[in-house]
Each structure stands twice: as structure tokens, then as C-alpha cells.
A protein has these predicted regions:
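Glycine-biased strand-turn-strand hairpin within the trypsin-fold
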Residues: 22-49, 53, 57, 67-96, ...
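Hydrophobic membrane-insertion alpha-helices, especially the h-region
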Residues: 1-14
């Protein structure tokens, strides 16, 4: 199993073929290091002032080992590993927020819509300084997620630091069963359909097929595919989603590991929406698997990508089970769009740059929201600077906006970005129906 999503309280996975076997350490340096580890473990067991639990010490060492790597590699205790497997089905107990580490602080990337955290007023960019009174300083993402999760009806208190607060403020949130509805759809009228994918779970492609069937029943002639605030998910589901919008045998994405091995993923089925114009909406919260879909449609010229620069997570995590029921999530590869672009740290640059208020770059200002490049220990982009996609962050010379980013709405009336997308599709249809210049009647002469 492979991850293609931002580390978060909800948990996101990506699947890819069989899990590789864990190889034994084969070099002398590795053996010598293990000898030092066992020596320290023995000294602690024999000489520490109080009795110690060996398993907890070993787990702590493994956790520390993975914490020296990138921000998406992590250790999972047996109970965490089991819960991770449940998460891919889209249902778990918790408060519903995406979190990451920014500037050595636990930071909210985004609350999931309609969840307890969202209803309590938690915002993207909030700094979580305490969980149930315990400082988050030096707390790993795995530990933070574990503390925030729990049975329905129980409470957790997050101490939040926000620019507008004079001092940190406590938010007491009642946990609930978080059921992630990964696909939503709506007929916007005038032949324009709307499909939103909130994340890529086990059943996303099935739900997407149902949504597309509804759109075809409505006889839509243009489509908005909304991937805003989609933090990623299962790789196979991202590929299957792209399958609906591209012809067969088209490359969707390829991934490469340290040894240069390359896996390619192609579309298989006939395109469902052949010939109709598509606008893909993205923003700073669009990460990983959602960036794969947006990048594939952009590279093949199948859709216009509109919105703001995406998150920029271009790495792949493999989930490796351990013998005692625990597991590790290890970054094993990077992924590339069909044209060979790595979006690690850079993200997908939209074709049409429009901020959450519907404004274009001349008058827009950036939203202060963490991206991959802001996370501690993030991996570099391995492409030469002259080959990297242009980073079109809005108004770099202006201070970032401290207000909460606007949430996607289901209607163009309360969602300026969606309104811009709908307007573009309508104008597209008008221009497409114009007769060729040679056939058009000239304007009447003015006497």
C-alpha cells in the first residue's frame, strides 16, 4: 500500500501492487550501528532509575529514526496501523483536520468540511500549541493524530495560536464518526455540470462513476471538476478518476524510486466526457493524488486548470507491515506528470490564476497557508531549476493574507472561483458555436 496524500488526522492512502519485502542490513556500517543500538538498549534496561518497557523504547527509537527523514515517513503502532486500514474506507473516529509541521510547529493545513473541527471554528494555518494540555513541541505527527482521535462523544481540547488572538485560545471539540463523502455532484444549469472530489478513497472511482452517470442524464455539455482542498489519497483511485476524462492508453503518471525503477500508469477505458470542455479547480489545499489528476489533464490539454498554486507534494509513501502488527509509512518514490514534471515543492501552476475571491494576479494577494515547501524536512525537487515549472505564487512582494481561505461552495453565487469557471465554460461554448471567419456575414455598411 502506498500513500499519495498529506499527513492528516483523517489519514490518506495510496495503493500500488504488492508490498516489497524488507531487506536485512547488508553492510558492515549498518551492523556496527545496530551493535551500538543494542548496547544502549541493554544499558538502559540495566541501569535506568525506573523499570522500562522495552517495546516502548524500541518503538520510540523507530519513530525517531523515521523522523530524521521527510515529513511524510512515520511509524505506526499496531492500533494505529489497524486504524489506518480503516481510514481508507472513509470512516473513523476523530475531529477531522489535516495537520502538518511548519516552522517546527504543529499546523492545521485545513479542517475537513462539516466535521467537528470545522464546526468549532478551526482554521487553516492555526498553530496547535497543546493537545489536552500537553505541549506539541517535539510531538510527531503520528503522536498528534493519535491524541486527536478517539471514540465518538469524547472530547479533546486544542490550544490554538492564531495571529488575531492576543493569547492562545482553547477549543474543546467533541469527537464524532468522520464519514468522508469523497464525491459530490450537482447540475448547475445551462448545461454545466459540477463534480467535486474531496479525497481519493477506496470507493471514489465507484462514486465518481455514479456522479458522471447523473451528469450524463442531465445532458451536461460542460463540466467543472473541483479538486480544491483535496489532500490526496489512493494512487489507483487517482488514475481511475483520470480514466473518465482521458482517452485510453494515455499516461496519467509515472513514479521513480531511488534505484531509477520506473512504474507507469495508463488509462484503460474510453473517455466518458469526450469532446466537452472541462475546467479543473485547484488551490493551496490540492495535494498529491489531486495534483496527479490536475497535472495529467493539463499535460494532455484536456482541461483548463484554474485557481491558485497547488500544495506541491510530489512523493509516494509505501506502507510496510511489521511482524508485531505495527507498520511504517516510508517515502519510496517521487511521481511525475505525463510531460515529466516533478511538482515536489512547486505544485501545479494553474493555466488561469484566480484567487478565492475570484481576482486575477494583478489585484490578488496570497493566502498564508502551508504548502509542502513550508514543511520541515521536505524533499527537494530533483529537476534542474531551468526545467522546474514556473512558480506563480500570487504577489510575492505583498504580505500574505491572514484571513481564513474561502471554502468551496456548491453554487457560483457564493463561490467566486466556481463562478469564474462557469463563466469560462459558457464563453467557451459561445465561441465554439461561432461560424468560421470566412463564413461569417460582414457587418452592415454604415452610410
Amino acid at each position: 500500500m502506498v500513500f499519495l496524500g498529506v499527513t492528516m488526522a483523517a489519514g490518506l492512502l495510496v495503493g500500488r501492487g504488492p508490498v516489497p519485502k524488507v531487506m536485512a542490513v547488508a553492510d558492515m556500517e549498518g551492523y556496527e550501528t545496530l551493535k551500538v543500538f543494542t548496547e544502549v538498549l541493554s544499558l538502559v534496561q540495566k541501569n535506568y532509575v525506573e523499570d522500562v518497557k522495552t517495546k516502548e523504547i524500541v518503538y520510540g527509537a523507530i519513530r525517531g529514526m523515521l523522523n530524521t527523514l521527510d515529513p511524510h515517513s512515520a511509524f505506526m503502532k499496531p492500533e494505529q496501523y489497524k486504524e489506518m486500514q480503516v481510514e481508507t474506507k472513509g470512516e473513523f473516529g476523530g475531529i477531522g483536520i489535516q495537520i502538518g509541521i511548519k516552522d517546527a510547529m504543529l499546523t492545521v493545513i485545513a479542517p475537513l468540511e462539516g466535521t467537528p473541527a470545522d464546526k468549532a471554528g478551526i482554521r487553516a494555518g492555526d498553530k496547535v500549541v497543546k493537545v489536552d494540555g500537553k505541549s506539541t513541541k517535539d510531538m510527531t505527527l503520528t503522536e498528534a493524530v493519535e491524541k486527536m482521535r478517539g471514540p465518538k462523544g469524547t472530547q479533546v481540547t486544542l490550544t490554538i495560536l492564531r495571529d488575531e488572538f492576543a493569547a492562545p485560545k482553547d477549543f474543546t471539540i467533541t469527537r464524532d464518526i468522520i464519514k468522508i463523502q469523497s464525491v459530490r455532484h450537482k447540475d448547475l444549469g445551462d448545461g454545466v455540470g459540477y463534480i467535486r472530489i474531496t479525497q481519493f478513497q477506496e470507493r471514489t472511482s465507484e462514486d465518481l462513476a455514479k456522479a458522471i452517470a447523473k451528469m450524463k442524464e442531465a445532458k451536461v455539455t460542460a463540466l467543472v471538476l473541483d479538486l480544491r482542498n483535496n489532500p490526496g489519497g489512493l494512487l489507483n483511485q487517482a488514475v481511475e478518476a483520470a480514466d473518465f476524462f482521458l482517452p485510453p492508453k494515455k499516461l496519467v503518471v509515472y513514479i521513480k524510486g531511488r534505484r531509477g525503477d520506473k512504474d507507469e500508469f495508463f488509462t484503460r477505458e474510453e473517455e466518458t466526457f469526450q469532446g466537452i470542455p472541462i475546467v479543473v479547480l485547484v488551490n493551496e489545499g490540492s495535494a498529491s493524488a489531486s495534483e496527479i489528476v490536475a497535472g495529467a489533464l493539463q499535460d494532455w490539454g484536456r482541461a483548463v486548470v484554474m485557481g491558485t498554486q497547488t500544495f506541491g507534494k510530489g512523493s509516494v509513501q509505501t506502507v510496510l507491515p511489521l511482524t508485531d502488527g505495527s507498520g511504517i509509512r516510508l517515502t519510496t518514490a517521487k511521481y511525475y506528470t505525463p510531460k515529466g514534471r516533478s511538482i515536489q515543492n512547486t505544485g501545479i501552476a494553474p493555466d488561469i490564476l484566480v484567487d478565492a475571491e475570484g481576482r486575477e494576479p494583478e489585484i490578488a494577494a496570497p493566502v498564508d497557508r502551508p504548502r509542502e515547501k513550508d514543511l520541515d524536512r521536505h524533499l527537494p525537487n530533483d529537476q534542474a531549476a531551468d526545467k522546474e515549472p514556473a512558480i506563480k505564487d500570487l504577489k510575492k512582494d505583498q504580505p500574505a493574507k491572514k484571513t481564513e481561505p474561502r471554502r468551496p461552495g456548491d453554487s457560483p453565487r457564493d463561490d467566486p472561483q466556481l463562478k469564474r469557471a462557469v463563466d469560462l465554460l459558457k464563453s467557451w461554448r459561445v465561441f465554439r458555436n461561432l461560424p468560421p471567419t470566412s463564413q461569417a456575414n460582414p457587418p452592415p455598411a454604415t452610410p
